[in-house]
Regions:
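Oxidizing extracytosolic/periplasmic lumen-facing domains
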Residues: 2-147
């Protein structure tokens, strides 16, 4: 049986791991702004309604997804990542903005990592949502330690 101190340690480590992941996403978002671009083709783009609804918000939140193909140095790649920024559980208007240029069969700019061309995004950069999530995990870990 785990002690309260062990549960606290597990909770803090989990929150710090999530903060580390968010920090990586911010870093990759900044890196993606310097990546070269190529032209790709959208295979499919869609949004899904999330089941979690904010109190008083009838629109709820939505997640945006896409599948696309692009070519780098005569080799074809399949991509799924829209951005290192937050593209899930966003407001309806944000989801529509993301989907606006993503029509099946349409061409789209693809930004790829020159050192690892299979890593690509359609929207370079990160978002304020990444910073909010990073801060949330760090504050959560700090409060968990302070309240034990």
């Amino acid at each position: 049986m785990l002690t309260m101190a062990q549960w606290t340690l597990i909770a803090v480590l989990a929150q710090l791991a999530l903060a580390g992941y968010e920090l990586w996403r911010i870093h990759m978002g900044l890196e993606s702004k310097r990546w070269p671009q190529t032209t790709g083709k959208i295979g499919k783009a869609w949004q899904e309604d999330d089941f979690v609804r904010d109190i008083g918000d009838e629109e709820g939140t939505h997640s945006v997804y896409a599948r696309y193909r692009y070519r780098v140095d005569a080799r074809w790649y399949d991509g799924r990542r829209l951005s290192y920024g937050v593209t899930s559980r966003v407001r309806f208007n944000e989801a529509l903005d993301l989907l606006h240029q993503l029509r099946a069969g349409g061409e789209v700019d693809v930004y790829y990592d020159p050192g690892k061309p299979q890593r690509a995004v359609l929207y370079p950069g990160s978002s304020a949502g990444n910073v909010v999530l990073l801060a949330t995990w760090i504050v959560g870990a700090t409060l968990t330690m302070a309240l034990r």
